């Protein structure tokens, strides 16, 4: 994936190739401590030929980082909180609906805007594939409801979008 910047294009790797400071994250998580790490737009780092950290021209994708971290720390759930209440099927049309649940098969038949929802969907898909746990996309103001499955969209390996619908967003 490439991202346009004034005067040039730079790469946004789908998954960072190297996981730095993994123990710095997993030990506090194991101790049930809230850890805030990762994020988008930061300095992209990889390993040089000698195994040392080296900066590269790239964009750090926050959704991909969240998915990678969730898999790395063996998270039971991945929640991507955003400014929309749920995934919208048929986004941008009068038929737009927020499915409460989607399966990986459902996702493969759907298309999402490249710069907004697509990275979130792909990150959830990767997490569910790697862990067989559920992921969710929903409003920043409703993390507890998203976790409980009463708001937002839950993505699982075998859930069925026709099982439930939330009220229109």
Identify the meaning behind each predicted range.
Residues 1-169:
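C-terminal catalytic "cap/lid" subdomain
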């Amino acid at each position: 994936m490439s991202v346009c910047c004034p005067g040039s294009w730079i790469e946004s790797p789908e998954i960072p190739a190297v996981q730095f400071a993994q123990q710095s994250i997993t030990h506090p998580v194991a101790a049930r401590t809230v850890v805030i790490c990762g994020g988008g737009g930061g300095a992209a780092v990889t390993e040089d030929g000698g195994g040392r950290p080296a900066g590269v021209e790239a964009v750090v994708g926050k959704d991909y980082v969240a998915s990678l971290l969730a898999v790395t720390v063996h998270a039971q759930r991945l929640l991507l909180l955003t400014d929309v209440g749920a995934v919208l099927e048929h986004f941008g049309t009068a038929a737009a609906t927020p499915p409460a649940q989607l399966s990986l098969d459902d996702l493969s038949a759907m298309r999402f805007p490249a710069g907004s929802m697509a990275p979130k969907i792909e990150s959830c898909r990767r997490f569910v594939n790697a862990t067989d746990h559920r992921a969710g996309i929903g409003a920043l103001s409703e993390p507890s409801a998203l976790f409980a499955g009463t708001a937002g969209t839950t993505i699982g390996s075998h859930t069925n979008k026709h099982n439930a619908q939330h009220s229109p967003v």
